[in-house]
């Protein structure tokens, strides 16, 4: 069984692709390859997980008419040719895409070669590439209802190791890695791989009060941002590749509300304060609504996110054990965590039905 997954650029596109790839490999014995671009995180994440990566040109679609729009047909043609070659070289039997710059060429290549293909939309509002994929005949799979893309609701695929009970031995190893105190509650702050100016600024101004209140802060500031000086109770790092380790030590997470992030944090059972990115299609403001209504998280809009709002929300959660426990319980009882297997089974069934 041979499958190609397409999802590149940001972790939000790559991680669900790799989660399904691992489920296909581990449960169905599939050989899985990935399509990506040379610019994205996939250049390290995909090989690190043991999968072959085939590079194609990214095809960003300009949101406004400009000169880049004139170049679009040529970029699409080049990327389509590269994607077709990758599918032929791997002798792919099915393709699944997760949005982003590499997905549209992957869908078109699969369509042109007569291969079954699947389209997974993680966000509450579907992107253009995925809408195109379904219109071309792909099987639509939505994380939540009402995305604007036809298809069944299956949830967001996450790695099996991210869900389930907390591994205390893994937590101890993670604390040793970052120099964390086992007797202090840990606030894990991240703005994603590139970091967030607004989140970083608020944390910088709030950290002394948070530490004085008895907490410690593990802060992923972003690869391109200057690393602040560490001090007792404050542990800044550029970026965290092993999110599983970070989740095991976190008592509270402060982060953006990308669809993949929300799914992982919820499956890990960690209470969260989400600060939606106020750009794009506005999907981040929608992604966490279900878990917020369930009581597993809180949301502070980016424009309202300051040192004081961060401190107030954090103290309200961590200084009240019953509040913290109820949020954690709400996360743990959610349905997050099983979409990888569901999707892998669908792909395997489709391939098997065509060869029986």
UniProtKB/Swiss-Prot annotation:
Pfam families annotated for this entry? Glyco_tran_28_C, Glyco_transf_28
This entry carries the following GO cellular component terms, namely:
plasma membrane
Where does this protein have coiled-coil stretches?
A: none
Species whose genome carries this gene: Corynebacterium glutamicum (strain ATCC 13032 / DSM 20300 / JCM 1318 / BCRC 11384 / CCUG 27702 / LMG 3730 / NBRC 12168 / NCIMB 10025 / NRRL B-2784 / 534)
Q: Which GO terms describe its biological process?
A: carbohydrate metabolic process; cell division; cell wall organization; lipid glycosylation; peptidoglycan biosynthetic process; regulation of cell shape
What is the protein name stated in its UniProt record?
A: UDP-N-acetylglucosamine--N-acetylmuramyl-(pentapeptide) pyrophosphoryl-undecaprenol N-acetylglucosamine transferase
Q: What is the recorded membrane topology of this protein?
A: Peripheral membrane protein
**What family is reported?**
Belongs to the glycosyltransferase 28 family. MurG subfamily.
Specify the taxonomic lineage.
Bacteria, Bacillati, Actinomycetota, Actinomycetes, Mycobacteriales
Q: Name the pathway it acts in.
A: Cell wall biogenesis; peptidoglycan biosynthesis
Question: Which EC class is the enzyme in?
Answer: transferase
Q: Which UniProt keywords apply?
A: Cell cycle, Cell division, Cell membrane, Cell shape, Cell wall biogenesis/degradation, Glycosyltransferase, Membrane, Peptidoglycan synthesis, Transferase
């Amino acid at each position: 069984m041979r499958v190609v997954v397409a999802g590149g650029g940001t972790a939000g596109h790559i991680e669900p692709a790799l989660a399904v790839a691992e489920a296909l490999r581990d449960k169905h014995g599939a050989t899985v390859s990935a399509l990506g671009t040379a610019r994205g995180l996939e250049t390290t994440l995909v090989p690190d997980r043991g999968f072959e990566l085939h590079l194609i040109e990214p095809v960003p679609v300009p949101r406004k008419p400009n000169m880049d729009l004139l170049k679009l047909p040529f970029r699409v043609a080049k990327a389509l040719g590269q994607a077709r070659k990758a599918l032929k070289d791997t002798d792919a039997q099915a393709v699944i895409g997760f949005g982003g710059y590499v997905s549209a060429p992957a869908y078109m290549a699969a369509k042109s070669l007569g291969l079954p293909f699947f389209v997974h939309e993680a966000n509450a509002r579907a992107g253009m590439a995925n809408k195109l994929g379904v219109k071309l005949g792909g099987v639509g799979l939505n994380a939540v209802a009402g995305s604007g893309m036809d298809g069944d609701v299956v949830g967001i695929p996450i790695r099996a190791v991210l869900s389930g009970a907390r591994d205390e031995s893994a937590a101890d190893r993670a604390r040793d890695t970052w120099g964390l105190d086992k007797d202090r509650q840990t606030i894990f702050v991240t703005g994603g791989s590139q970091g967030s100016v607004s989140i970083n600024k608020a944390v910088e101004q709030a950290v002394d009060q948070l530490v004085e209140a008895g907490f410690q802060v593990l802060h992923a500031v972003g690869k391109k941002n200057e690393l602040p000086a560490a001090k007792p109770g404050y542990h800044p790092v550029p970026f965290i590749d092993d999110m599983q380790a970070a989740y095991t030590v976190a008592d509270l997470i402060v982060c953006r509300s990308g669809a993949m992030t929300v799914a992982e944090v919820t499956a890990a059972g960690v209470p969260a304060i989400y600060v939606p990115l106020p750009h794009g299609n506005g999907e981040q403001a929608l992604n966490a609504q279900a878990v917020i209504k369930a009581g597993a998280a809180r949301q502070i809009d980016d424009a309202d996110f300051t040192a004081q709002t961060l401190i107030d929300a954090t103290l309200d959660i961590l200084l009240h054990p019953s509040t913290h426990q109820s949020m954690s319980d709400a996360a743990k009882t959610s349905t997050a965590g099983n979409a990888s297997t569901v999707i892998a089974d669908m792909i395997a069934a489709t391939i098997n039905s065509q060869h029986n």
